[in-house]
């Protein structure tokens, strides 16, 4: 009966979450029936609810992205652009153009950047490697960061692309803070 009821909910186009809530209530009711002795066991305990779909990732609007990419240098004279500004611009361009995850950008090594070919070799989730092409704008921002910004941030040798003001690899939280600053 319980499976038929779940099939009815599916045919009636109820959301999976709603069907799972109904199933949870039925299971609770049967557990109570077992406790008070009305039934010997719960037939609902072995039934699994419908699988929940994964939500789509949030996507930033194009107007917000344009504002984000122009925020780093906004209102600054060329001589006032700092190493941090160059890093942040390269970081934002790279995240946008290459579709990197924050964790991938945080762990990106210089040996994984191939400027001549405009490619990145990225270690993604589950240690899966992928090759990512770079847009011209991201290449230009990275080249400027490698030439002017990164050397000013280095306090010693580091294999990481994106460095903090102390010369350490940028953490994922520090990268998220760049987004927050840029979005105001």
Question: Which residues does each predicted region cover?
Answer:
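Conserved catalytic core of the tyrosine transesterase superfamily
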Residues: 1-184
């Amino acid at each position: 009966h319980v499976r038929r009821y779940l099939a009815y909910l599916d045919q009636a186009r109820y959301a999976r979450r709603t069907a799972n809530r109904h199933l949870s209530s039925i299971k609770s009711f049967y557990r109570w029936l077992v406790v008070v002795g009305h039934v010997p066991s719960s037939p609902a305990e072995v039934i699994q609810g419908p699988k929940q779909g994964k939500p789509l990732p949030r996507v930033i609007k194009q107007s917000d992205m344009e504002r984000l990419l122009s925020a780093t240098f906004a209102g600054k004279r060329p001589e006032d652009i700092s190493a941090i500004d160059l890093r942040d611009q390269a970081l934002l361009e790279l995240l946008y153009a290459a579709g990197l995850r924050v964790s991938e950008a945080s762990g990106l090594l210089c040996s994984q950047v191939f400027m001549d070919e405009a490619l990145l070799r990225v270690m993604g989730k589950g240690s899966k490697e992928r090759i990512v092409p770079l847009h011209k704008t991201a290449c230009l921002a990275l080249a400027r960061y490698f030439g002017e910004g990164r050397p000013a941030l280095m306090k010693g040798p580091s294999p990481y692309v994106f460095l903090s003001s102390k010369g350490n690899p940028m953490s994922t939280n520090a990268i998220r803070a760049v987004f927050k600053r840029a979005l105001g």
